[in-house]
Amino acid sequence: MVRRLVAGFGGLVLLLSTALGFLVVAMRSKSPRMLGVVRRFNRGFTNKIQMRTAGTPGAWASVIRHRGRRTGTIYETPVVPFESGAGYLIALPYGTNADWVKNVLAAGSAELVCDGRAIAIDSPEVVSADAITELLPKREQRTQRMFGVDQCLRVRRAMETASV
């Protein structure tokens, strides 16, 4: 019985280590094929789980509401923004190819839901992660280095609106 538990636990650790290794290699290599796998997994699984609490008080992730470039449909995507001066910095692990990034850049504005508050944001600009790294918490700096994140989206606070 104990052997089975140890073997099962060892198998689980191996599986999780392999998945994390793939994720790190995919993100650092910027291989379109590997990033596509990660993006599809996140869109179909991880994002759905994060969206259950994203944007609520105390949640790790926030929500960015953005309008589709072609359809005009409002979409919601979980993001992890960091306050910086008059706005926020959001890491772009997939670069500027993520649909939400393209939508925000095209519209020039969006809405960020953080801690239960909807905040209008505008003036989006892509900045080098190197240029803003000192503005991020140390833990986030390590995470960005590990995953090879080299771009961030800087947005400005337009005005704060009522609680969501």
For the regions a protein language model found, what residue spans apply to each?
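Short amphipathic, positively biased membrane-proximal segments
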Residues: 1-59, 63-76, 87, 103-109, ...
